[in-house]
Amino acid sequence: MGKYFGTDGVRGVANSELTPELAFRLGRMGGYVLTRHVGEHPRVLVARDTRISGEMLESALIAGLVSVGIEVMRLGVISTPGVAYLTKAQGASASVMISASHNPVDDNGIKFFGSDGFKLSDDQEEEIEQLLDTAEDTLPRPSGEGLGTVSDYFEGKQKYIQYLKQTIENDFNGYHIALDCANGATSGLATHLFADLDADISSMGASPNGLNINDGVGSTHPEALAAFVLDKKADVGLAFDGDGDRVIAIDEIGQIVDGDKIMFICAKYLREQGLLNNNTIVSTVMSNLGFYKGLKELEIEDVQTAVGDRYVVEAMREGNYNLGGEQSGHIIFLDHNTTGDGLLSGIQLINVMKATGKKLSELAAEMKTFPQKLENIRVSDKNHVTDNPKVSKVIGEVEAEMAGNGRVLVRPSGTEPLVRVMVEAATKEETDEYCERISAVVRSEMALND
């Protein structure tokens, strides 16, 4: 990670860390790096989620883009994967999404996509960072006809919805689907998509007001949708995050079906159809041990990466794999889109239900999970957790006690000032005890003093 760019673009508290001034400079520097070889007036798409700070940052970013001669097409509120798809579909030179995904409303972020719809490489981000840190801005400052322009392309939402419908062979007639849009970017997309697929719909978290994104709803709060599914007697529930690149499912009896299980279900189905490239799925080190045991029983190969959907996508492209993702709900179907896509993943999952005639609880039960606990600890300097001798000592002690029947993962978050402690063990009691033992040391050594 660089000075400005984390694992998912530039993020920070809006108007104090991620300021309009920084957004303007990101527009100038990022726009220049991504379009300098394109020719006169390259086209860049700009979109945002529903945060109150979105319009402020959008205005500043667009000003920066226009100042280096870029033609901006403004998409309005749309999901991150919608932007990625439309970048290629519209032949744009690049695109920018303004969102902090699942983070609280005070945060916001800016992430770029290249003309191929993929997130930027480390080299591209490093070049933008070098320009940001240059004492004097010497980039072109055209005038008159050399300036860029701004136009709206709000109909891009419908084009994206129509594309998603083409990725499956079934409609959803006869299914009652509960949707939780996290008061975010899928609020204006999900109900239209599933209505077009002839499903019966109940929705929550679909009334954004600028302040309620991810607030007790969405993929980071699946318990809200679980209660909603039971109340509405739905066949399945889908909870998206603020920018729509994640999904967590709920089965008909209110159980959470996380990204691991969704990937497992879809991998099994794709393999049966002869559609799983190289008989391999890509996941991160956060996936449950039960996920890997289940894949082994199915004789499906797996490739593990560091945490972050960008690393999953990199491995998928390198190995020509078409399915990968994260336990958190970032799932990439590379045959259909270039990034995690909650809506796409949701319809692929329900398509498997329709094709097999099985309930989601039946499909999910085919993968057994190890008890797992995750603690997020706010710290003063997340990057030194692996260097702390007391933290290393307690991890070693726990791993020795596990004797191979479990695992520990302690790592810095790529997007927030947190250390994440994840433990899996044979029983829930052991998992809780080991996780608390390690977390206590991390808190003692590194936690912020409130």
From Swiss-Prot:
Names of the cofactor(s): Mg(2+)
Post-translational modification: Activated by phosphorylation.
Cofactor binding remark: Binds 1 Mg(2+) ion per subunit.
Pfam families in alphabetical order: PGM_PMM_I, PGM_PMM_II, PGM_PMM_III, PGM_PMM_IV
Metal-binding as UniProt keyword: yes
Residue list for modification Phosphoserine: S101
Keyword Metal-binding on entry: yes
EC number(s) from the headed UniProt entry: 5.4.2.10
Gene3D superfamilies: Alpha-D-Glucose-1,6-Bisphosphate, subunit A, domain 3, Alpha-D-phosphohexomutase, C-terminal domain
Catalytic reactions of this protein: alpha-D-glucosamine 1-phosphate = D-glucosamine 6-phosphate
PANTHER family (UniProt xref): PHOSPHOGLUCOMUTASE (ALPHA-D-GLUCOSE-1,6-BISPHOSPHATE-DEPENDENT) (PTHR42946:SF1), PHOSPHOHEXOSE MUTASE (PTHR42946)
Family, similarity comment: Belongs to the phosphohexose mutase family.
NCBIfam families: glmM (TIGR01455), PRK10887.1 (NF008139)
Protein name: Phosphoglucosamine mutase
Lineage: Bacteria, Bacillati, Bacillota, Bacilli, Bacillales
